[in-house]
């Protein structure tokens, strides 16, 4: 046993210090990034935000809607090959280039993903969907995936420390997913006591990944557009969003009605709801590590997407970053004990 004394921070613990700016308008900010990935050698350009690979967020409908904003969607792994074929037949090449194919790490998952990728060459992203990226099995699966799909861009995780981030990159991952426990419907931290404050995880993993030519995606912990800006400011190349994109028409959650008001169910992928739906229930040897919540219906996702992108542009103007790429080097975090004036929050 050992104790680390270093302070670790989450998004709620900091604000971004404003700096002089020559920008006249938020419209002057360029949010599009251009990347060439380490292993796949694929080039990509777009807004580096990803809808999470949850079946109440990462749907085909979400992918179609967010593609118009140049945003990626990690489509959840529970669609059948036949459903993928129907989606591909009805989607433009522009939509498909904004799609990540999610997979588990079993042999059956591998074969299914192979079939999906063979359906259309425009599917260039693979997202390896595992809660615990510290398992040797995950490292082996990443290496297997890299050998099988040398030109596909592979995202793998989840981890929160630099040494494991490096291990996944050296095994073949182009992008490492960073985050254990910060999600809005994740209960891993309270069920297991395991986790890491998200901002510190992003800062440390970005440093490790960038030293090897890899990239990271901050996965979880964002509740506002300001948190998205903090993740990018901390060094994230991509930011993955779940709860912020849940409850919309495109989110895919089941709609329930109470007292004449309609709600959409949103749950973590290790929750009892998810396991009942996909594997028949919670196995006797494990605990559910997610919760289910009822969200008021939020309408089309386009309004939320505009709000997130608008907040991100505004953050860039406050620090003088004309491009999202510049946000990290222009970010100075200050530690705080309050984020906002909450006097009217309950009205």
Curated annotation (Swiss-Prot):
GO biological process: purine nucleotide metabolic process
Spans traversing the lipid bilayer: none
Catalysis performed (reactions): IMP + NH4(+) + NADP(+) = GMP + NADPH + 2 H(+)
A single Gene Ontology CC term: cytosol
EC number of this enzyme: 1.7.1.7
UniProt-annotated binding residues for K(+): 181, 183
Highest taxon above the source species: Bacteria
SMART domains to which the protein is assigned, alphabetical: IMPDH
Active-site residues from the entry: 186
GO molecular function, one term: GMP reductase activity
First-level EC class: oxidoreductase
Annotated binding of NADP(+), by residue: 108-131, 216-239
Keyword annotations of the record: Metal-binding, NADP, Oxidoreductase, Potassium
Family: Belongs to the IMPDH/GMPR family. GuaC type 1 subfamily.
NCBIfam families given in the database record: GMP_reduct_1, PRK05096.1
Function recorded in the entry: Catalyzes the irreversible NADPH-dependent deamination of GMP to IMP. It functions in the conversion of nucleobase, nucleoside and nucleotide derivatives of G to A nucleotides, and in maintaining the intracellular balance of A and G nucleotides.
Classification via HAMAP family: GMP_reduct_type1 (MF_00596)
Subunit structure: Homotetramer.
The name this protein goes by in its record: GMP reductase
């Amino acid at each position: 046993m050992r104790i680390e004394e270093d302070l670790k921070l989450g998004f709620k613990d900091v604000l971004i210090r404003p700096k002089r700016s020559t920008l006249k308008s938020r419209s002057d900010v360029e949010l599009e990034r251009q990347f060439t990935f380490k292993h796949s050698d694929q080039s990509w350009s777009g807004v580096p935000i990803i809808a999470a690979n949850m079946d109440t967020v990462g749907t085909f409908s979400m992918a179609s809607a967010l593609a118009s904003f140049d945003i990626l969607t990690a489509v959840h792994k529970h669609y059948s090959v036949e459903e993928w074929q129907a989606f591909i037949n009805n989607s433009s090449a522009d939509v498909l280039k904004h799609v990540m194919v999610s997979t588990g790490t079993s042999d059956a998952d591998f074969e299914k993903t192979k079939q999906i990728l063979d359906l259309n060459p425009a599917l260039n992203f693979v997202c390896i969907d595992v809660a615990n990226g510290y398992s040797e099995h995950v490292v082996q699966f990443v290496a297997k995936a890299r050998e099988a799909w040398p030109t596909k861009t592979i995202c793998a995780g989840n981890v929160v420390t630099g040494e494991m981030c490096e291990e996944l990159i050296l095994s073949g991952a182009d992008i490492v997913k960073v985050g254990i426990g910060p999600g809005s419907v994740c209960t891993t931290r309270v069920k297991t006591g395991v986790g890491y404050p998200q901002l510190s995880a992003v800062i440390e993993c970005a440093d490790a990944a960038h030293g090897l030519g890899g990239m990271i995606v901050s996965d979880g912990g964002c509740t506002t557009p300001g948190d998205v800006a903090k993740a990018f400011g901390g060094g994230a190349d991509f930011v993955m969003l779940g709860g912020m994109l849940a409850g919309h028409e495109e989110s895919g959650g089941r709609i329930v009605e109470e007292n004449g008001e309609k709600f959409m169910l949103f749950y973590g992928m290790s929750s009892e709801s998810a396991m009942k739906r996909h594997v028949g229930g919670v196995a006797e040897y494990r605990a559910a590590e997610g919760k289910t919540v009822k969200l008021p219906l939020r309408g089309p996702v386009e309004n939320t997407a505009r709000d997130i992108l608008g907040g991100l542009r505004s953050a860039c103007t406050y620090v003088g970053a004309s491009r999202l790429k510049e946000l990290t080097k222009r970010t100075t975090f200050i530690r705080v004990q309050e984020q906002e004036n909450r006097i009217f929050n309950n009205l």
